[in-house]
């Protein structure tokens, strides 16, 4: 028996199927060990003619449906029934695979006896693909100890007997989301699920026009698939507690990432009864005992969806978005909420950490100015206080910076280096946090991972004069989590900057090892017997120009004792 059947449904794919076929023809795997099963859904272009050109390059099976089915489900089923490989790999006609995909997958499957193998995906041309489940290769994962429930597309490798023996096919009457039901059935029936993440094996490509798998689907059809998935989980040959946990995780995924997320705030009011009725049919298939296992913020939504109460459902989503509630209190760090008069209290709702976006970050040798916004926070403005926290990497020292400006939820903090420079030498690395306080509860969030474009090149720094020593302050982004931190270290001034006289009244300050930024404005140079005023301007990250108020002779330039900026003095002798 050959190792793989690569299943490709096609429909008007002439513009891009060549890339897929080339990737299959270039596989570092014996051509006798895999077949390519193409089932066409009545294309009206040159798709099949292009496929036929690969007869001598690939072990091809090509067929065409008699009538257009309107979706990839039926072509995949026809191909699956024709498949002779030990394993099947579903590939969309507008995607392609790594030349080592089949070779590496075969070796991995033989070693670990996988029934389902997830291969690492990579998006091309801005196509979004699941990533969280591909952080590492894993010979065996489950629906609960991994993130595989967050990828329910069929573009995986399946043991053929797993599918055929358990009658796992795509529901042909459904034209969208049918792949989620297919994949969930495979997960539930597999003895071993594995993840191969050594490299990008599957390239999902964003193309112009309509993807074969994408088409409008009504709320009734969409939520019917979700209901069928819930039923499939509940009917699985597993312990009830285990099934309930899987269903809860599926609901977490569904309400966080599907069209259900925020639908009452997006869909036209006149269409919302249709949506809530269909959603309600889905949720009514979920036993109420499962509600206790989902993310706590979803419990009110499940309650009102099950009751098909669109008004209160909308109130919940709007309340979460605004962070404003009819009644609420915080007990032991959790929210108790009543969304409307006469409605039940929902207790023990976790307050998720807010997401912080750094919208601005500017610094010089005088101050650091950063602007932050809070996003997706369950508590509205007016119920919390914010402050910036600088925490030393060794956790021994902490500095707090109060809020300077609150402009329409844009929080600005001014870190005056003069105020903190005495504390900075205590530690080389200072991490930046935003603290959000609600009563006695404090939420701490690292800053910088989400940000607007950073205004400086890497290693751009500021010079600080403290007592008789000079220091370099360098903001940087951490390697692992891409958050902003401050690096503070002693330097030798003459190794870091140089001064040159340009003409008779300009001094050029240049960074020798990196760019240095200075506060623009009034400056002065102090000579042995004189002081000359000037105006400092930053001409580039690596260069500063000081335009003097009068000419200076070269012999006097060599005797400059000090350089004064608006808030710093640099002793040069």
Curated annotation (Swiss-Prot):
Entry's EC annotation: 2.4.1.355
Pathway note: Cell wall biogenesis; poly(ribitol phosphate) teichoic acid biosynthesis
Coiled coil region boundaries: none
Residue numbers annotated as active site: 179
Deleted gene: phenotype: Deletion mutant has no growth or cell division defects, but mutant shows increased susceptibility to beta-lactams. Deletion of the gene leads to the production of only alpha-O-GlcNAcylated WTAs.
Positions annotated to bind Mn(2+): 94
Disulfide bonds: none
Induction profile: Expression is up-regulated in the presence of beta-lactams.
Keyword terms, alphabetized: Antibiotic resistance, Cell wall biogenesis/degradation, Glycosyltransferase, Manganese, Metal-binding, Teichoic acid biosynthesis, Transferase, Virulence
Cofactors, names only: Mn(2+)
Principal EC category: transferase
Keyword Metal-binding tagged: yes
GO process annotations (BP): cell wall organization; response to antibiotic; teichoic acid biosynthetic process
Binding residues for UDP-N-acetyl-alpha-D-glucosamine: 9, 41, 68, 76, 92-94, 127, 178, 207, 211-213
Reactions accelerated catalytically: 4-O-[(D-ribitylphospho)(n)-di{(2R)-glycerylphospho}]-N-acetyl-beta-D-mannosaminyl-(1->4)-N-acetyl-alpha-D-glucosaminyl di-trans,octa-cis-undecaprenyl diphosphate + n UDP-N-acetyl-alpha-D-glucosamine = 4-O-([2-N-acetyl-beta-D-glucosaminyl-1-D-ribitylphospho](n)-di{[2R]-1-glycerylphospho})-N-acetyl-beta-D-mannosaminyl-(1->4)-N-acetyl-alpha-D-glucosaminyl di-trans,octa-cis-undecaprenyl diphosphate + n UDP + n H(+)
Record-level Gene Ontology MF annotations: hexosyltransferase activity; metal ion binding
Additional notes on this entry: TarS is a unique target for compounds used in combination with beta-lactams to treat MRSA infections.
Subunit structure: Homotrimer.
Family per record: Belongs to the glycosyltransferase 2 family.
Role played: Attaches beta-O-GlcNAc (beta-O-N-acetyl-D-glucosamine) residues to the C4 position of poly(RboP)-wall teichoic acids (WTAs). Prefers UDP-GlcNAc as a donor substrate and is specific for poly(ribitol phosphate) WTAs. Can also use UDP-Glc and UDP-GalNAc, but not UDP-galactose or UDP-glucuronic acid. Mediates beta-lactam resistance in methicillin resistant Staphylococcus aureus (MRSA) strains.
Family annotation (PANTHER family): GLYCOSYLTRANSFERASE, UDP-GLCNAC:BETAGAL BETA-1,3-N-ACETYLGLUCOSAMINYLTRANSFERASE-LIKE PROTEIN 1
Name the record gives this protein: Poly(ribitol-phosphate) beta-N-acetylglucosaminyltransferase TarS
Originating organism: Staphylococcus aureus (strain MW2)
Gene name per UniProt: tarS
């Amino acid at each position: 028996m050959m190792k793989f059947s690569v299943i490709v449904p096609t429909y008007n794919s002439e513009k891009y199927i060549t890339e897929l076929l080339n990737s299959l023809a270039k596989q570092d795997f014996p051509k006798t060990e895999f077949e390519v099963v193409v089932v066409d859904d009545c294309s009206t272009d040159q798709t099949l003619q292009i496929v036929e050109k690969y007869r001598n390059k690939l072990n091809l099976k090509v067929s065409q449906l008699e009538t257009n089915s309107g979706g990839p489900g039926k072509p995949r089923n026809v191909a699956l029934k024709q498949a002779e490989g030990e394993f099947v790999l579903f590939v969309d006609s507008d995607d392609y695979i790594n030349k080592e995909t089949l070779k590496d997958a075969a070796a991995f499957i033989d070693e670990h006896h996988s029934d389902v193998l997830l291969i690492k995906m990579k998006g091309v041309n801005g196509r979004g693909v699941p990533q969280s489940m591909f952080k590492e290769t894993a010979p065996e994962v489950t629906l609960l100890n991994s993130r595989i429930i967050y990828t329910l597309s069929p573009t995986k490798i399946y043991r053929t007997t797993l599918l055929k023996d358990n009658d796992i096919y795509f529901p042909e009457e459904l034209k969208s989301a049918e792949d989620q039901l297919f994949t969930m059935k495979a997960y539930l029936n597999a003895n071993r699920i594995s993840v191969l993440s050594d490299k990008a094996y599957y390239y999902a490509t964003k193309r112009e026009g309509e993807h074969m798998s994408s088409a409008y689907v009504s709320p009734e059809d969409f939520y019917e698939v979700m209901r069928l998935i819930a039923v499939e989980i509940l009917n699985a040959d597993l312990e009830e507690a285990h099934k309930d946990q899987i269903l809860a995780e599926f609901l977490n995924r569904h309400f966080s990432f599907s069209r259900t997320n925020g639908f009452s705030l997006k869909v036209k009011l006149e269409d919302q009864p249709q949506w809530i009725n269909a959603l309600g049919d889905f949720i009514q298939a979920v036993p109420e005992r499962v509600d206790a296992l989902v993310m706590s913020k979803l419990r009110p939504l499940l309650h009102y969806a099950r009751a098909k109460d669109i008004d209160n459902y909308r109130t919940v989503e709007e309340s979460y978005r605004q962070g404003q509630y009819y009644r609420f209190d915080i007990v032991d760090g959790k929210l108790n909420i009543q969304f409307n008069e006469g409605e039940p209290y929902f207790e023990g709702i976790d307050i998720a950490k807010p997401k912080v976006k750094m919208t601005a970050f500017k610094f010089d040798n005088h101050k650091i100015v950063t602007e932050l916004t809070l996003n997706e926070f369950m508590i509205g403005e007016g119920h919390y206080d914010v402050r910036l926290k600088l925490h030393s990497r060794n956790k021994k020292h902490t500095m707090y910076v109060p809020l300077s400006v609150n402009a329409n939820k844009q929080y600005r903090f001014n870190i005056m280096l003069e105020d903190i420079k005495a504390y900075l030498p205590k530690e080389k690395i200072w991490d930046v946090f935003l603290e959000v306080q609600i009563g006695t509860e404090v939420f701490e969030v690292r800053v910088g991972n989400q940000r607007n474009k950073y205004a400086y090149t890497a290693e751009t720094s500021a010079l600080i004069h403290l007592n008789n020593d000079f220091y370099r302050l360098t903001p940087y982004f951490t390697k692992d989590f891409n958050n902003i931190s401050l690096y503070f270290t002693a330097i030798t001034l003459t190794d870091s900057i140089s001064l040159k006289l340009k003409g008779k009244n300009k001094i050029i300050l240049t960074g020798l090892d990196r760019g240095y930024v200075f506060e623009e404005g009034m400056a002065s140079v102090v000579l042995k017997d004189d002081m000359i005023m000037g105006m400092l301007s930053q001409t580039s990250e690596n260069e500063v120009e000081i335009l003097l108020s009068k000419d200076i002779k070269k012999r006097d330039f060599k005797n400059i004792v000090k350089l004064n900026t608006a808030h710093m003095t640099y002793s040069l002798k």
